Amino acid sequence: SDPVNTTKPNILLIIADDMGLDATPGFSIDTSKPNMPQLEALMNSGVRFENVWSNPVCTPTRATILTGRYGLRTNVINVGDVLSTNETSIFDLMNTNAPEYSHAVIGKWHLSTDPNHPTSMGVDYFAGLLAGGVQSYSNWNLTENGDTNNTTEYATTKFTDLAIDWVDSQTQPWFLWLAYNAPHTPFHLPPGAASSLPTDSASIEANPLPYYQAMIEAMDFEIGRLLESMTDAERDNTVIIFVG
């Protein structure tokens, strides 16, 4: 018989913000879809879960993923509720039961505005956005392990750059929670987008759908850039989970 593979897999959890089945390839809901070759490739080579439900808003969903508990038990039921540091997180459990894993959260947190909250929840490395949104994807506050500074780097690209750098520095099995802010408002045309869409706010407000889709396409491109930065062996040994 073939030898058993004892190599522990890496785990990559990718979270899109405000993206439903209407914008997801492979589902019949809605006929206008963004172009997402990276996600389509993952779906075609993986498993598609068709009976999965989430909270309709950010904070309770993220708290449930982090703790495995319903909002009625964590008291996180509304946008902006703070998750108590007394809760046991998946990172706490990994620290206890799988200490060989390194782990990070990169991107949107939205469980507290305390810059030390992610590390208090057991996260080895946090770099991202504490709040629920930004006024501009190109002018926002980046918090990295407790230190907050303004950045003008495009958020979707910056999160990917941080993810690439972190993954590249790992020497042991890893778990990366990569939470994009896209395609959450404000709707806009991403930099470098191959489109002739006008960029004034009146045009966006009049017909936001193509801008929403362009933001998703930019995120899909960045997912591809992250995957392409890995070696074939590392990518083959990585469990990739995409949720919206």
Residue ranges and their predicted role:
Residues 2-244:
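Formylglycine-dependent sulfatase
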